[in-house]
């Protein structure tokens, strides 16, 4: 079997944890500065919009993003592992993960358009191709 397609999936899992830690490391000090008495009872992350600095919230926005579209990536990789995959699939998986990590860093640290949108569109296009590859592998 070609290079392991599970490796880029595992890298994205670890990257998601890195973003969780980055989010916590920036939100914690921001919340201490704000004072939790300013939060409504049962407040959630989205309730922090406008209360803590935008650049702190960007990390949370990206963490949430990593729990959305990448679920399709994980499903496609799983299907390919079960149905068979080739070097192109592994390359696409790595490309998707690399672009998603670059997108994460950009969104969390800079968050300017159009670069962020371009990174998202590129990763989405790669994911769409990988999803079609997964479908074809099942036929």
Residue ranges, per PLM feature:
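Hydrophobic transmembrane alpha-helices of multi-pass small-molecule transporters
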Residues: 17-20, 101-104, 128-131
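Short membrane-interface loop/juxtamembrane segments of multi-pass integral membrane proteins
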Residues: 43-66
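Structural signature of hydrophobic alpha-helical transmembrane segments
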Residues: 87-97
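Interfacial loop-to-transmembrane junctions
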Residues: 102-126
